[in-house]
Design a protein with these regions (language model features):
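A short, Lys/Arg-rich alpha-helix, primarily the initiator
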Residues: 1-17
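Short alpha-helical DNA-recognition segment
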Residues: 18-38
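DNA major-groove recognition helix of helix-turn-helix/homeodomain DNA-binding modules
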Residues: 47-64
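Short, charged recognition helix plus adjacent turn
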Residues: 66-90
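Short, surface-exposed "cap/lid" segments of acyl-processing enzymes
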Residues: 85-129
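Catalytic nucleophile-loop/oxyanion-hole region of alpha/beta-hydrolase
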Residues: 123-146
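Gly/Ala-rich beta-loop-alpha elbow adjacent to hydrolase catalytic centers
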Residues: 155-164
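The alpha/beta-hydrolase serine catalytic core
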Residues: 174-267, 271-292
């Protein structure tokens, strides 16, 4: 999926770095400067593959390119030893809560066993369903899993990140979160599906539910619910996104980053929505350990 709102930011980046349209076009594999000109004016799209190539070619951090202040997460609680050396407070009880995606399982939490030196690691289990049906389940399970802990870290995958933002923002003991291929706007996901299949609001309202060719089912009740979603997420969050993700589109991701100054983006240039190969799991491990 392409992103049309990125044009002014690309132009600003190019100007700040004294690049001509010809030079930028050549470095990104475009034929001629006219493509860059159209992108900057908002008349043409720039795919996330090209954005990832831009980041890699010019050794940029996504937050730097989009002028997003990726503030560091709050440090873990510390105490000052007699020698004035700052060390971590070993008396704190810490837990990592993993929230799986669609058709996933809490058992996937075992993939994060390497964190057990400092954290208990648990998975939050839930059955797929409508968001309004899952609210009490997810909040109840999360409270049960985190009771008695001083510090909580959330690792959420795909739609699990949506549930975290939607239902866990009021839990004050969450110190940091890691979102992998997060669905950051369920409403936008539904709108994109409707556009893809040529479905209008009126048609969905009249039919109530529409089964799509890919097996997904659109529901008007679901559409109404997510249209009123309110994101109050303030937790310092690391976001991992595949450049070839065909589920979460560029526009949704950029809006999330702009709306959440405590979020920081990492793009894996050769990944899709699902991170499941041994190499991709090693990438996730290094990504988490780098900032936790």
């Amino acid at each position: 999926m392409a992103e049309k709102t990125i044009g002014p930011k690309i132009k600003d980046f190019r100007k700040r770095n004294n690049l001509t349209q010809e030079a930028l076009a050549k470095s990104l594999g475009y034929y001629g400067k006219s493509v860059i000109s159209h992108i900057e004016k908002g008349d043409a799209d720039m795919t996330y593959e090209k954005i990832a190539l831009l980041l890699e070619t010019y050794d940029l951090d996504a937050n730097e390119l989009f002028d997003i202040e990726g503030k560091s997460a709050k440090p873990r609680a510390k105490r000052v030893a007699a020698s004035n050396e700052v060390v971590e407070d070993d008396n704190l009880k810490r837990v990592v809560v993993y929230i799986h995606g669609k058709n996933g399982s809490a058992k996937e939490a075992k993939d994060y066993g390497y964190l057990k030196e400092k954290y208990d690691v648990v998975g939050l289990d839930y059955k797929d369903g409508n968001p309004w049906e899952l609210k009490d389940v997810i909040q109840g399970e999360f409270k049960k899993l985190t009771d008695g802990y001083d510090e909580v870290v959330v690792i959420a995958n795909s739609i699990g990140a949506f549930y975290a933002c939607e239902y866990l923002s009021n839990f004050k003991n969450i110190k940091k979160a890691y979102f992998i291929s997060p669905i950051v706007s369920m409403f936008q996901q539904v709108v994109d599906l409707m556009e893809m299949y040529g479905i209008k609001d009126k048609e969905l309202k009249e039919k109530g539910t529409i089964e799509l060719d890919d097996g997904n089912v659109l529901s008007f009740d679901f559409y109404q619910h997510v249209a009123n979603e309110e994101d109050k997420w303030k937790v310092p969050t690391e976001v991992l996104y595949g450049a070839y993700d065909q589920v979460v589109y560029t526009g949704s991701m950029m809006e999330f980053l702009e709306d959440h100054p405590n979020a920081r983006l990492t793009v894996k240039s050769d990944a899709e929505h699902y991170f499941y190969t041994p190499e991709e799991k090693r990438f996730i491990k290094n990504w988490i350990l780098k900032s936790l």
